[in-house]
Design a protein with these regions (language model features):
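Post-transcriptional modification and biogenesis factors for structured RNAs
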Residues: 1-100
Length: 100
């Protein structure tokens, strides 16, 4: 069974996001194991230090064998079909764990 890790900084506070996440976890859990991993926000006053520390905390929670898919508001947008194809291609090549 494939394993998806959703790794994020801080807790999801918005009720609508919590509800959507719960719905997707319920739907997908028939096909994949899903873990949601929340690392604490860093309180450093300097943004670059905060990003560095949070990045280190995220990386500590990701297995070396995991395929990392970075999700970024400013990143390349892909369709659900393309994401599914990407995951399928990786799975065929032996990858069973993905971290988002």
């Amino acid at each position: 069974m494939m394993h998806f890790n959703i790794v994020c900084v801080g807790k999801i506070k918005e009720a609508y996001l919590q509800s959507a996440i719960a719905d997707y976890v319920t739907r997908l859990s028939k096909y994949v194991k899903i873990d949601i991993i929340e690392v604490p926000e860093d309180n450093s006053p300097q943004m670059d230090k905060r990003i560095e520390k949070e990045g280190e905390m995220l990386m500590k929670r990701i297995s070396a064998s995991s395929c990392v898919v970075a999700l970024d508001l400013h990143g390349k947008e892909i369709s659900s079909e393309k994401l599914a194809s990407f995951i399928s291609d990786k799975a065929v090549s032996g990858v069973s764990e993905f971290s988002f």
